[in-house]
């Protein structure tokens, strides 16, 4: 059967919701019905289409910048983010940062392009989050050799695990005299 909405309209609806932060049920009338847009988004996510689009764009940006399509070094960090009582999903309490909410664990290349992201409860340690972030990454990032990280990632257990999981070397970056790491 023919599609009721062109894929371009569906993509525009998804980008509109992403850009404005509007709830999916509040899409303006010029876009497909929210149920259609959400179903399309969900199907594409489950099929890995968004991941493929992201990878293609990231590789294109790297090549345009004169870099290899896949990086050899990367930077790993985390950030605890407050959530509200109404927000659903995973949450916890990060005692070190005094934050009740979620923690984003990210791996970026030297151009600050996202390689991997994992969202956990805020109470998740950086070392445990790093394992969740990196597991299964080797086939997607075959050239990755070096991961720069800050103090919470130091220690032999993570370094040993990284060496075994992906033959990655973890190098801890010390803060400068100004108190900044990255």
Tell what function each PLM region has.
Residues 1-182:
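Short alpha-helical elements
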């Amino acid at each position: 059967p023919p599609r009721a909405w062109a894929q371009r309209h569906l993509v525009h609806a998804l980008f509109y919701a992403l850009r404005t932060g509007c709830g999916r049920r509040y899409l303006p009338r010029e876009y497909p019905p929210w149920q259609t847009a959400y179903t399309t988004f969900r199907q594409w996510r489950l099929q890995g289409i968004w991941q493929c689009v992201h990878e293609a764009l990231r590789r294109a940006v790297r090549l345009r910048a004169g870099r290899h399509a896949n990086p050899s070094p990367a930077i790993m960090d985390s950030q605890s983010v407050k959530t509200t009582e109404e927000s659903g999903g995973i949450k916890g309490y990060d005692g070190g940062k005094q934050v009740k909410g979620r923690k984003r664990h990210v791996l970026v290349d030297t151009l600050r392009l996202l390689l991997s992201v994992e969202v956990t409860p805020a109470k998740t340690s950086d070392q445990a989050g790093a394992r969740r972030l990196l597991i299964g990454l080797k086939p997607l990032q075959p050239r990755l050799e070096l991961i720069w990280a800050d103090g919470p990632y130091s220690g032999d257990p993570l370094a040993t695990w990284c060496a075994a999981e992906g033959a990655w070397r973890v190098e801890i970056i010390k803060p400068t005299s100004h108190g900044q790491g990255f």
